From Swiss-Prot:
Induction of expression: By heat shock.
Natural source organism: Cereibacter sphaeroides
CC annotations in GO: cytoplasm
Official protein name in the record: Co-chaperonin GroES
Gene Ontology molecular functions: ATP binding; metal ion binding; protein folding chaperone; protein-folding chaperone binding; unfolded protein binding
Similarity comment text for this entry: Belongs to the GroES chaperonin family.
Length: 95
């Protein structure tokens, strides 16, 4: 993928939501909620303070993260549906 986010932005791929319930019912696409969990694909270098000093990113490519339901901007890059969001939109890293 030939895309690198700038500054404190992060490129995230949502995890796939389940197609069936535990009881075996198939969930149609119109009834599915978009998951607020994803994997960091790439991230920028970080934000800068007024002094010009770089603030390092807390996340890195490969991290599994949780983010707000309405976070980010949906984009399609190389046929993949991804989200671009600021690092501050990420709520935490799953381990």
């Amino acid at each position: 993928m030939a895309f690198k986010p700038l500054h404190d932005r992060v490129l995230v791929r949502r995890v796939q939501s389940d197609e069936k319930t535990k009881g075996g019912l198939i969930i149609p696409d119109t009834a599915k909620e978009k998951p607020a969990e994803g994997e960091v694909v790439s991230c920028g270098e970080g934000a800068r303070k007024d002094s010009g000093e770089l603030i390092a990113m807390s996340v890195k490519a490969g991290d599994r993260v949780l983010f707000g339901k309405w976070s980010g901007t949906e984009v399609t890059i190389d046929g993949a549906e991804l989200l671009i969001m600021k690092e501050s939109d990420i709520l935490g890293i799953l381990s």
